[in-house]
């Protein structure tokens, strides 16, 4: 059942736009799809949503874009959202490493997964002005046994200010409820708590920080200006990537005294976080497992599942 709404503001092209910035594994892609369906099927709007990401795995950058407009207008733009009315940040650790706030203006609203206050977040993100909405989505997701994207969905709907909670609950029931009926109530609790527990504060431009214009990401070196004969051996590599933001509240805890050095954990780890060095095991020379490099561990817990003696355990 539709509950038609009127968009409070639109840009020069007639659209209300949302951009989600996330890391693979936190559910921004699904959240973007749900927001697209919400506008088209439940709010009486024309809607478009699409995502942009590289390798389809946890830890890689993900962007999702949503456009809404009235039923009297068609969505004819499919380019990235450059100046969002709402910006959703699924992890605060992304700030500073990626230009996630590019295109954010003094009239925009940012919804961020963080336990910090809006004032602290404004300082960390170096925002020129605008509205800051903070919700501890990780904590709520762990307590409700839901997912971060469900909590963020509720918080984004609350930040919009013109969307009732009822059509959002109906959307979750009609989509996720049919696919995962056992998790329906947990997901609904996550949406409700995100809607109710988000905190916000408005900041006027005070000259502390400059507005960051949007521009497409590009490498400093390309085929036109790269040194002749030069080779960038780290191009496209994750050697410097901090994957800790993609965790969802748990990390594997390595118990070295009980490890039998079978190497199954190293075989299943997608990011090769286990470190080995020459040593002795049971009186013989062997490559000994020294544990994890948590800088590259994204908390997928595959090592916990594959450990033959279950000597790698979950740790909150």
Explain the meaning of each model-derived region.
Residues 16, 250-252, 288:
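Short amphipathic alpha-helical segments
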Residues 45-46, 131, 265, 275, ...:
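Residue-level detector of anion-binding/catalytic polar loops
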